[in-house]
Amino acid sequence: MEKYIMALDQGTTSSRCILFNQRGEVCSVAQKEFTQVYPRTGWVEHRPMDIWSSQISVAAEAMAAIGAKAEDIDSIGITNQRETTIVWDKNTGEPVYNAIVWQCHRTADMIEQLKKDGFDSVIRKKTGLIPDAYFSATKIKWILDNVDGVRERAEAGSLLFGTVDTWIIWNLTKGRVHVTDYTNASRTMLFDIHNLCWDDEILTYFKIPKSMLPKVQASSSIFGHTEEGLLGGEILISGAAGDQQAALFGQCCFEPGEVKNTYGTGCFLLMNTGDTAIESQNGLLTTIAAGDAGHIEYALEGSVFVAGAAIQWLRDEQRMIKKASQSEEYAKEVEDTNGVYVVPAFTGLGAPYWNPYARGTIVGITRGFSKEHMIRATLESLAYQTVNVLHAMEQDSNISLKSLRVDGGASANNFLMQFQADVLNTLVYRPQCIETTALGAAYLAGLATGYFKDRNEIKDNWTLGGTFSPQMDEQKRKELLKGWKRAVRCALAWAEDIE
């Protein structure tokens, strides 16, 4: 039997396992959802044992589906929801509290205080991040400050912190290994991305004991072995990366200026910037990209809060479509939006505007406005928001975009991808294998063991599924983008206190 790479893909709503062969083809998939916990409005938690039990069960299931044994698995690569925070007892393995999920904003007041203290510039300079409750630092502090006896136990050295990758590796190795990779460390708001170390000044500010923190190493390197009894024998763990960085690697965006966009609930855009950590002047995050061969690479990251969620809104709240795929059919029934723009700022606007108080708007409505126009305008809004982030990336990097690689659920929408190419005036490439996040984790693991020879071999595996070339004339493109800017101004104006 040929050997496989096992990718453990631990997401926000489910745990998945995919077995890949040397050609980067999917050989087996297993998936299991787990319970979301909402203790209060705006709070989001996961039970750490649910994360672990679902992940190990799908690993066994994926192996069993094709009759694979431990000796048939070359190595394991892990990719995970980023920033989600777990604290546990290093002697018993028992979590002291539920995992606080990246979406949870219970610590927003800590961020406001941080800004009042003038500490936001320190965070920005050292971590590359714009201070936000999204990241791990304030979540750790909340657990230390609000769970009885936890701060004392942490200061005594008996507690450990980890992002989800760390928690999975710790359990796979039965507590022998407490480690993370550079990409996940770079999302904690505690890690100096320039000197590649946990930052003492930031730890002191948040009153977080350094003894809690994991060792940090390259995304493609040897992390340890699984405990023999878990999957029928020892398996090497040799890759780990946060989900968006794993997708950048899975899309083979290895050169500075190469960009991928994942069209999920929101959009996550990452641009490889090589060995240069660019400090954004346009509201983007500077982060560490997944690397191999012992060298560090950086990326610029921009987020669009609402993308696929806008299509869900058409389906669930507006009841204009019965399934997401119908949005393409309706959009193609009209030649344009009849001058209408939808700005889906349901939870504010992300990069490059960063206004949490902006609200969704529909502008330019006339009597001739139809359901089809509404659906088309909503789809087009995903492309316009992507243009805004990519233009910010071009300005920060001084690199002109040559093409965009796409993945995620909404990338299957051919109308959207063509419109994206048109308003961006750039080629859009969609790969045949859209499992780019798990594939990135598999590639990182396989490079560390020699299963994959080098990046060139991986590039050869990348197979084009579809190309979308710009077909819009320059004048029309400029007019549409000008209209979008006016529509965004309306969404931003809603946040202003106007008498």
Curated annotation (Swiss-Prot):
Keywords of the record: ATP-binding, Glycerol metabolism, Kinase, Nucleotide-binding, Transferase
Keyword Transferase: yes
Gene3D superfamilies, per database record: 3.30.420.40
Binding site for sn-glycerol 3-phosphate: T12, R82, E83, Y134, D243
Gene Ontology biological process terms from the UniProt entry: glycerol catabolic process; glycerol metabolic process; glycerol-3-phosphate metabolic process
Cellular component per GO, a single term: cytosol
GO molecular function, one term: ATP binding
Pathway membership, UniProt: Polyol metabolism; glycerol degradation via glycerol kinase pathway; sn-glycerol 3-phosphate from glycerol: step 1/1
Entry binding sites for ATP: T12, T13, S14, T265, G308, Q312, G409
CDD domains referenced in this protein's UniProt entry, alphabetically: FGGY_EcGK_like (cd07786)
EC numbers: 2.7.1.30
Stated regulation of activity: Activated by phosphorylation and inhibited by fructose 1,6-bisphosphate (FBP).
EC class name: transferase
Listed Pfam families: FGGY_C, FGGY_N
Catalytic activity field: glycerol + ATP = sn-glycerol 3-phosphate + ADP + H(+)
Residues that hold ADP according to the record: T12, R16, T265, G308, G409, N413
Family, similarity comment: Belongs to the FGGY kinase family.
Subunit structure: Homotetramer and homodimer (in equilibrium).
Function: Key enzyme in the regulation of glycerol uptake and metabolism. Catalyzes the phosphorylation of glycerol to yield sn-glycerol 3-phosphate.
UniProt protein name: Glycerol kinase
Organism: Lachnoclostridium phytofermentans (strain ATCC 700394 / DSM 18823 / ISDg)
GN (gene name): glpK
